[in-house]
Amino acid sequence: MEGFEASGEEGKKKSKFKAFKNFFSKKKKKEPEEIPEVAVLKPRFSSSSVSGSSLQPALEKQVMESKPKSGMGVKSISHDSVFCLDPEPEKGAGKLHSSPAPHRSKSLKIKSQRSQRLSISPLIRSEKVCEELEKFFASDRTTTTFRRRSSQCSSTPRMSSELSLDPETSESSTQQFSGFSTPATSQGCLDSSAAKSKIALNPRKQKKRKSTSTPVKVKQEEQLQSVPAKEKTTTKTKEAEQGEQKVDSTELSSQEQSSKTETQDTAVDKTPSTDPALRLNPRRRRRRAKNEWEILERGLLKSTQRYSLNTKAESSANKEIAGKEHSFLKLLLEKKDIGQPTTTEAEVTTVQKMPSDKGDVERELADIDVEAQKEPAPQPTSTDVAESMISGPSPHCEDKKKKDKVGVLPWIKKSTSQKEVTVLRKEEVQVHVHPSRVCGEGEEASCPELQRVQPQMKVSLESTTYHKEKHPRSGLPVPSTSISSATAEDDVSPKMNLPLPLRRRPNTGETSSDSKSTSEYESSSEMQLSPAHSFKPTRKPKDDAGAGTADDEEDGDDEKEEKDNDDDDEENVFLKSENVDVEVSKMEKQQALRYSSKLLGKPKAREASAKLESSSEDERSCEEMTSAHSSQSLEEFEECSESRGFIRGSISEERPATRCHSQALQELEEKEVSTESSSYIEKYESSEDLSSSEQEQQVPPVSKSSLKQWSAPAKPVHPIQTAQQQPPAMVNISGGPKKSGEPLSPTQTVKSRLRSQSECQVLAEPEGVVAADWDILMQPPPRPRLEQEVSAGPELTVFEKSIAVQPSGYPPQPSVKPSIKKEISLGAESAPLESPPPQHHFQPLLKPFVKQQVSAFERVISMDPKLPTQFQPRMKPQGKQSFSSTPESTAFEGSTSVDHMTLTLSQPMLQPYQEVPLESETVAAKMISTGQLHSKYSAHPLSSHQSQPVPESTSAEGEELLPSQPSVTPKFQPLMTQGSIPSAWAIPIYSPAPRMDSKPLMGSAIALESKPSRYSLQPWQSTPFEQVSVTPDHDPAAAAASWSPPIDPPTSRIPSQPLMRLAVKQPTCTELASVSVSQSSSLERLSSRFPFQPRADPEHYGAEEGVATLRRSRRHHSQSPVRSEFKEEVSSGSRRAFGERSISVGKMPPKYALQPWLCPEFQQQAKEGDVLRKAWLSGHPSQTISKHKVEKTPLPPKCPSPFLTRSKVQEISSRLESVIAQESSKKPQRGRPPSKSFVNFMAQQVFSESAPSKVVLHPKPVARGRRRPSRSLLKPKLDDYAFLYNWDNEPKEDTTLQNLPMKQPFQLSRKPEEPQEVLPFSEGAPVKWNTSARGISQALGKLSVSVSLPNEWKSSEGQLPSTQPSQAFDVAKLQSPVLPVDSANVPVKWRISEGHQPPQSFFVDYQPQVSVDSASAAAKGASCWPMLKDSASTTNVKYSQGYKDFTKSTPTSVIKPATFTSAPAQKPMVSMGTYFKDEVPKCCDETGTSSLLPTSKADVENVFGVRLRSTSQKIGMKNPDPCKPFVLISAAARKEQANKGDLQGSVGGSKQSRPAFSFEKKQGNWPRYEGTLKKSEVFRPPVAFYDQKMLHPRTRERLTRRSLSLPPTLPQREEPEWFSVAKKKAQAWSQIANIMQ
């Protein structure tokens, strides 16, 4: 019972405690109701003793009334004050402090007194300042001085919350302070010390505000009933105080925060009255608020601008802190500007309320007076201000300001805190112009006058930033634009931005982030565009921001008034208004052209800020055209309210045009992700030379010139819009937009001229360039319209229509912004793109950057519309305009192509999308599968470098209509930007032949070298791309370079050369292969005449390339020029891609056989020259794939396109080997006439015998030389990697290959050599590509490629005629030094092109830098060395030399050639296998590359039978080391090859056994080669690579069976007795070599 009683007592205590708690909570609730000010003041008072002291007299009474009810309540309050900082001030006021509280208060008395002392002088100053404020309201100077003083006193405190609040609170509480007791002060200090970090921080203080705001609203309603007038005035003061409080919160001032909290409670109590009224009557409330705000704003705007130096730091600090609070402007204006706009009214009320709280009765009375004054003033002010704003800064605005000042004077006087008033005004200004002030105030530090100009600039900048936050997608571009144009548009931009800065303006700011340029631009567009289009966006944004409803926009005056009244509401309604603006802008996006240009211009404007002055000059000239609006904007910008009114007025006047612009900009910005926009803009900026950049740059400055010119040309609303849209983003890239402007056929020359000018000028002055460019751009009105339509989804459709309606002369609308691109990607573009298919085939000048970031979107776009792709580039033009930066330039260039080619060039537009490796791949596949475009519409992206990347995608899209060969190279693209693009377009436009898949120009070079219209898209010389080939990004450049040869011989068949280039080359080797496999099959569907040669994207490139090859299978063997770099990075992927192309080539006659080159670039170029010549003869542009230098001399079209591929065997070795194994198993290829290349010659020697026997040897590319010995050397390494078994399997392969016609001997030499420079001599490299050539090409791909490709190869084997040689090149990644050699060796493959026979031997000399282990890896990923026995093998010498150099350069590289199966029906593979084995041991024996090289030469010189033996014998004499089998290969290796079984038997001693094994094959093959030297028998490096086996078990089994059957088969066929003896000797030699080692 006792326990129970105890527990009961405890329970009673607890219940009592709970009861107390509830009681106190109820009390507290009642207290706020009865005394909301006190409740509010509690937290704030605790945080700031000064503010608490100011309110303490009344608070004490109120607290005594509410708190005496219970001592416990007082105690709890005191405890709460310790934590909440609220009760302690009340205790100080009510003198009801708990024992600990007084101690603390006493302990803090000194601090509070000190702070008070410190604040006394500011207080005195504030009093003086109050007097000055009265004078200041009469004169701005006085106000400026006063605000400077107050801000000087408060700016630093504002920057630091306590300091700023202490002076203010001390100033405001000086009167209060005298009435306060020290405990209250100590409490304030205590609160400030304890709650500074807490309350000063936004969380708690904000929470207090929020918590108090909701209950205070109810309380306010009650209080409003009791004291409506006071509540109204208090609401205003509350708003001001809230703004100040926000600043304080950002400043982390606990004391003032507490006072503000109290003030907020009182103010909030009153605010709800206004808020509910505002909510009930949003327009009325907004108008009232706006009117009041206009009054305060106007006075504050000037004053703030003048003392912006002080407010600078404050605004920045406020931005940082308040911005965090504010969610809307999170990106850049997350700072004070973010928070203030939403809480502007509350802040103003709070700020005003703080003075009212400080001087309770007096302030309330003053507030009432202020309210009375404000209410009449704002109403006339709003109307008058609107009018004055329209007409410019007028005395009426001055009157309004004076009214505001008068209304604020008593308010400020009684508050005695000039800082608060200043802060209030500042916050008001910041709320309206906070973006500008955030940046503007920072910039205004220099001088008060500059403060006006700079704040204006910064208003635009900040509004842009604010808009950024509002539209993060477009935020990034917008800031740049507003920065650049803001400086120029300091006066104009602030105008527009000040009214909109609250929220709506940021959108408009972004739309017209360069307010000046926007205003000018809009005025110009107003002249040219319908007035509704020109300035509507500005007005509409405001209407949307201010009223947040379309109804507000209906009445211009009402809108102005509402905006003035809504300025307060804009803060609360800002998000909604922004949404409304977004919606409206979306509605107006249909006219997005003008908007998109603005949008684009804005991103660029920031970067072009340095160029801002020039832009401002242009804008000033534009202002001259729209001087009334510009001057009004400038003048009104000085006055926030006036500027706002002016903006509204100008909007009402220019609303038709500008409204759509800004809205379109807003919508586009919304669509454009800030990240995307930023990256997109960065791309633009990176490619300033590109036309889209130029256009974008042109847009803002062009507004004046464009007004003049555009009005002259026909006042093209759209061109103006386009210029407007583009210029801000394109300021840096003004050169780009100019280029982009070129695409219009009629204006193409002008655009080209613009590009040339803008490219040169963009860097210097985008403004002047833009002006000149816009003059030109204004001439093609259709394009602007297209841009307008393209800018948004609806606009995109309009754009599409415009293009369709307009002749191809205006096809390219580079005006299309990145946002448009994005929208295109969204799918809006796709619909419009489809509508105008033939009219505008402007090859999108895809910019490298645009390719990367915009490519995803663009690809989607390109995928969707086939014919509309023309418009896509236009839609993308802005992105392409700066060829590298965006597809806008592509659009322009593409536009030109479209104009000339009409429909033919529409597809290149898609290429920018395909530029993205992954997405582009999918896009390419989709486009290919669609195949809507006719082959005649060869998508040859002549327009620009960017356009070239796009052309690939476009080609993929173009598919049948235009097997566009987008040779896109980032580096090359800049070349196309200026004059070259026009010529390219003109040529491609006219030249595009239905068959001739436009070889996507890798840049303007193609255009410059433009050949007959059918070759319009022919890529220029790839030389620049060769340089680009260093990077995977530059693979397209290589492709373009290779394309250039097709340009020289304009053959319709050569149109599409998928340039497997940088993008494909390095970045997505692995993915590329897989994609290429699937796409290759899809391409097969397409007719060969539509060979689509996807450009550089590694993934899509391979896939598209394969597809293009398939398309071209019959008519064109697409020779995807693969750069050495591409070889390196895309080695596997490239190979696969090439394999796919080979497959498509397989469909094509052997003349179309592809030849991947792996030799040094110079050799590749030399060979490529032959190949190109052959390719041109054969009429297959794919041969242009050969090196850039080779491009100069296109080969006959018959020649299979050689794939210049270099790869690092180390990375790709395993994959290559598996690919080779698959290829060998999949594709037996017949040998064609031995290729001229050294490797081809050796392959011919080796394959000549195997070709008659239809034996596919798996030659191991040996660094030893390009001739057969290297293959034997390769064999040993392959033996190390189960090459013994592979060689056993190889006979089977040979047999299988025998089944294939000898025409298609695919000689894929693998270098199983260990990490030695011997590898560079992949004599097995000469492989002939036939139907299985595709498989071989795939073999070129990485292991994954080999895995996926072999299946396709197999299928392609059956599909492709044996006559078509597929030349695969070892894509294995070679050492960087090896790569050039590979390029040299690769040309060997071109020899096939001589006879245009499928067995175009590719001497893919790849020297994988691999050690013995590397050799194993190489064996796994052994790079394929396709070698064809074409009569064209004359190139072998060059390659052999280059190959030797390559070998030397890569001493450690071990090349593991992927096994290529050339099915020489004549020769059994057994001898070849033996030969390889012999060579491989030699390679193993010969660590020195030099010995291998001579051996390879000797082997090449001699038929594989005898000479190779000699070489191997010599090698054996020199180097018994199996790692040096090259020397041993000639004789000893042959002997060891005779001991093929031994080699097979011993994997550990595979080097020795390899030599024997290889020699067996060599010896067996040598007689055959002697008999049929020119019949290149494909040396299939045994697919015994473990990786290959694992990757392709079927291939391994197949190879194993073949190897088992081939040795007997080959000897049975053509193996002479001496060959068998030689095999035995080779085996013995390999063993001897091992022993010697």
Swiss-Prot record:
Basic and acidic residues biased stretches: 229-249, 355-374
Tissue specificity of this protein: Predominantly expressed in testis (at protein level).
Keywords for the protein's UniProt record, in alphabetical order: Cytoplasmic vesicle
Bias (Acidic residues): 550-572
UniProt biased composition (Basic residues): 103-114
The keyword Repressor is assigned to this record: no
Transmembrane segments: none
Composition skew (Polar residues), residue ranges: 170-190, 341-353, 745-759, 879-896, 935-956, 964-975, 1017-1030
Pfam family for this entry, one: DUF4592
GO cellular component, one term: acrosomal vesicle
Residue ranges with Low complexity bias: 141-156, 250-261, 508-526, 689-698
Compartments, as annotated in UniProt: Cytoplasmic vesicle, Secretory vesicle, Acrosome
Keyword Calcium in annotation: no
InterPro entries per the UniProt record, alphabetical: CRACD-like, DUF4592
Domain of life: Eukaryota
Record region (Disordered): 44-121, 141-293, 341-404, 438-759, 865-896, 935-975, 1017-1057, 1090-1137, 1182-1238, 1539-1558
Cross-referenced PANTHER family: ACROSOMAL PROTEIN KIAA1210 (PTHR47743:SF2), KIAA1210 / KIAA1211 FAMILY MEMBER (PTHR47743)
Oligomeric form and interacting partners: Interacts with TOP2B.
Protein name, entry field: Acrosomal protein KIAA1210
Gene, per the UniProt record: Kiaa1210
